[in-house]
């Protein structure tokens, strides 16, 4: 199975990390979730509806759409909060990345554990920039909103391509493809990881600083 890999890069102020990451992760999971399956008999099932809601960011001029699931939101906020704290405590330049990996399980014979086979991975590289003035922060608020909008549009375009998705499972195999542990939504199986890095490249950060500098010069 070929695993599709997508990489995004963002440059944000420290207080924008959480909102930017939640916007990206929620957007991806919005397109990788279904309503709960309700099986009538093997081979016959109905799919529940998925509620959605708008989220207005406090530190970015941006509004994104997420699945209306408090359980899913709490799970994402927990790991994003850990990532934000790790960035803040790194003592470096605020470089890091988060990865959202979708996978399906392949049953193995006893005594071996099930094999997890990834089929799509989203990686978001993050560079936190330090700003000196409130004027710079206001400009960054607007510019990050514009850049984040571009990233979200890119995600939607990628999701619209007719590429691999796991086939709909039978009732006995649904847990090999979907996370059935949530009460109100059923995302494809996924896991999120993050790391703090020493070197990430400066192209995105340089672009953001240039945008702020050019705007101040107007």
UniProtKB/Swiss-Prot annotation:
Report the locations given in the UniProt record.
Cytoplasm; Preautophagosomal structure
Which residue intervals make up region (Important for interaction with ATG13)? Answer: 152-156
- Record-annotated disulphide pairs: none
Asked if the Swiss-Prot or TrEMBL record annotates the protein with the keyword Cytoplasm, the reply is yes
Biological processes per GO annotation: autophagosome assembly; negative regulation of cell population proliferation; positive regulation of autophagy
| UniProt key word Cytoplasm | yes
| Cellular component aspect of the GO annotation | Atg1/ULK1 kinase complex; phagophore assembly site
Q: Name one GO molecular function term.
A: protein-containing complex binding
Entry keywords, A to Z: Autophagy, Cytoplasm
Pfam families, per database record = ATG101
Q: What does this protein do?
A: Autophagy factor required for autophagosome formation. Stabilizes ATG13, protecting it from proteasomal degradation.
Q: Which family does it belong to?
A: Belongs to the ATG101 family.
Q: What does the record note on quaternary structure?
A: Interacts with ATG13. Associates with a complex composed of ATG13, ULK1 and RB1CC1; the association with this complex requires the presence of ATG13.
Q: What is this protein called?
A: Autophagy-related protein 101
Q: Which organism is it from?
A: Mus musculus (Mouse)
């Amino acid at each position: 199975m070929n695993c599709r890999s997508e990489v995004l890069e963002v440059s944000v102020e420290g207080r924008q990390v959480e909102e930017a990451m939640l916007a990206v992760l929620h957007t991806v999971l919005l397109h990788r979730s279904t309503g709960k399956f309700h099986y009538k008999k093997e081979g016959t099932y109905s799919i529940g509806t998925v509620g959605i809601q708008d989220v207005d960011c406090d530190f970015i001029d941006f509004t994104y759409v997420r699945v209306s699931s408090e359980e899913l939101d709490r799970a994402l906020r927990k790991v994003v909060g850990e990532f934000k704290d790790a960035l803040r405590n790194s003592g470096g330049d605020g470089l890091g990345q988060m990865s959202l990996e979708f996978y399906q399980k392949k049953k193995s014979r006893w005594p071996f554990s099930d094999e997890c086979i990834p089929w799509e991975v989203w990686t978001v590289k993050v560079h936190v920039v330090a700003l000196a003035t409130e004027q710079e922060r206001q400009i960054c608020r607007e510019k990050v909103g514009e850049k984040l909008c571009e990233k979200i549009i890119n995600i939607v375009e990628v999701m619209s391509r007719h590429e691999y998705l796991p086939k709909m499972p039978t009732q006995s195999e649904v847990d090999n493809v979907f996370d059935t542990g949530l009460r109100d939504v059923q995302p494809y199986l996924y896991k999120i990881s993050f790391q703090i890095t020493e070197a990430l490249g400066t192209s995105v950060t340089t672009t953001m600083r240039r945008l702020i500098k050019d705007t101040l010069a107007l």
